[in-house]
Design a protein with these regions (language model features):
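Transmembrane beta-barrel architecture of outer-membrane proteins
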Residues: 52-56, 99-103, 137
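Small/polar glycine-rich anion-binding or flexible loop at a beta-alpha turn
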Residues: 76-81, 97-101, 122
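C-terminal outer-membrane beta-barrel translocator/porin domains of Gram-negative envelope proteins
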Residues: 1-88, 128-131, 140-145, 151-152
Length: 152
């Protein structure tokens, strides 16, 4: 992952992903696009392939580093995700499957224990598997840091 932060409260982030296989792979080894990694506007694993190139890009405002362990910090962001996937079918890769999604959201660090992320994701590409673009979705992720557990 790459992040360029020209000021303490502005960041540009890129998260490239890639996979190459010279032969067909079982489904559990294929690159999957959709949901929280790349393709946030789509269902998990809506597209999968043996060969893939993907990029998740974000512009972030704010910082997720609280002033103290009891404070909170908020970061807003907008994103564009894209992925291109190919399947090896008898030695021929054929044409690429492609998806793009865009959106924005808010991340919050709550003390030194919790992180909350909420985003609105919009599918841009029409996928044959969905019969179109699909629906706009709201994604919510809550993470709790269990260790180290400190007494206050």
């Amino acid at each position: 992952n790459f992040e360029f932060r020209p000021t303490p409260t502005l960041a540009f982030a890129l998260a490239p992903r890639a996979q190459y296989a010279p032969h067909a792979l079982p489904s559990y080894e294929q690159f999957a696009a959709g949901n929280f990694t790349v393709g946030r506007g789509y269902d998990p694993s809506v597209l999968s392939g043996d060969i893939a190139v993907a990029l998740a890009s974000e512009v972030r405002l704010g910082s997720l580093i609280p002033a103290s362990r009891n404070d909170s910090a908020v970061q807003g962001y907008v994103f564009v995700d894209s992925a291109w996937l190919w399947n090896n079918n008898g030695g021929s890769t054929g044409s690429a499957q492609h998806l793009t999604s865009t959106g924005g959201g808010v991340r919050a660090a709550i003390g030194d224990r919790f992180k909350l992320e909420t985003s609105l994701a919009v599918p841009v590409s029409k996928l044959a598997a969905l019969g179109g673009r699909g629906n706009v979705r709201i994604l919510v992720n809550l993470t709790m840091n269990l260790l180290p557990w400190k007494r206050r």
